[in-house]
């Protein structure tokens, strides 16, 4: 029992030394050369446990498949800020995050992660041992050593190991020296890092583009076009696309929107943006969060292209960017009046793309933005008319039919009687419900759960959305329990 108390006290003093460090990667062991070998072994065991935890954390970082940009760190599941935001409570340091200086940092032996928080007021007073010891967590069980237990354990330690005494003044001096050395090392490292240019594997290519733009002529723009053409190939890659976009989006946006440049250069820059965004959620989230005005800029430049009868290919690129950005957002808006004017262009593929954008904007996920924007109901009615017309086209595929139908239903539910639905659409809806009811009798058709779910929504919407809601409720009661329905209700 006494040996356990001795070991426990040694552990407390050792962890107390570790808690004063300002850099989480550095692990210090007691430097008292007068301590006997048994005491040193105990301290070394604690240091080994901490080192092992650091190794496990490093291993997790290596296996997390991180993509690190200037502002975000992304893995296959989520993105989070690259800068650690401290608070007064212990917070986990996420893989790849950068820490501001001056934080209290520890390794949680219970969780196996690094944690940091803002220093406590007056924590600079290293001699205040009682405050340092309070709340100190010991072992994986999370037990806490109280002041009375610490005093009792210290007395047992002095009786059992009379030869081992740690002088408070020497300890304070040792810790102060360690902190001074570490601050110097961190300062030197930060200075060295600040002198290194921030870069990525394509930074030389973009640096050359920027250099060529300083002295523009026909030859230099040809070189810029060649460089952009080479970069298009890499933009399709998940990781490389994010690196390009997170580091060079402003340059690519400038090249795309600059109407003084050739269509070839503008189109290539826009194509790099589209390729970096497509099927790349971290890239989409990065642009939406850091550059939320991009969708408005796209609408403005689309309006200019439409007014000047500009390149149809560039229009398609801008529409594709807008379409992808709207696929993962609840915080950006569009100018649907601009899109309506653009919709008048006689280009079937562009018309479909514009309707896809409208279907993404008028959606339940985007309701917060729609509530804050003054809607022109004349334009909204025009979109409803177009959607209800094109959805009746026999050649329209199932995916577009579902997307357009959900949009029509949302607009009708959201704006109610302010939007009118023509009888042709209602007749088509009745016929479509009957056709799908017949198909549902087929065993193979029944296997498609998503298809049956959509067919059910289609049937319910006939009265619940586009008709009389009371009739819908009556129909449900007839279907669920027609035996109990009284004659008056029929």
Curated annotation (Swiss-Prot):
Looking at the Swiss-Prot or TrEMBL record, what is one Pfam family this protein matches? SIL1
GO MF term list: adenyl-nucleotide exchange factor activity
Its GO CC terms are: endoplasmic reticulum lumen
Query: InterPro entries annotated for this entry?
Result: ARM-like, ARM-type_fold, Sil1_fungi
User: Which residue ranges does the UniProt annotation give for the motif Prevents secretion from ER?
Assistant: 487-490
Tell me which UniProt keywords the record has, alphabetically: Endoplasmic reticulum, Glycoprotein, Protein transport, Signal, Translocation, Transport
- Give an example GO biological process: protein transport
- Protein name per its UniProtKB record: Nucleotide exchange factor SIL1
The subunit structure is:
Interacts with KAR2.
Q: Which residues form the signal peptide?
A: 1-24
Q: Which residues are glycosylated?
A: 258
Q: What is the role of the protein in this entry?
A: Required for protein translocation and folding in the endoplasmic reticulum (ER). Functions as a nucleotide exchange factor for the ER lumenal chaperone KAR2.
**Its family?**
Belongs to the SIL1 family.
Q: Where in the cell is it found?
A: Endoplasmic reticulum lumen
- The species this protein belongs to is Kluyveromyces lactis (strain ATCC 8585 / CBS 2359 / DSM 70799 / NBRC 1267 / NRRL Y-1140 / WM37) (Yeast)
Query: In terms of one coarse class, where is the protein primarily found?
Result: endoplasmic reticulum
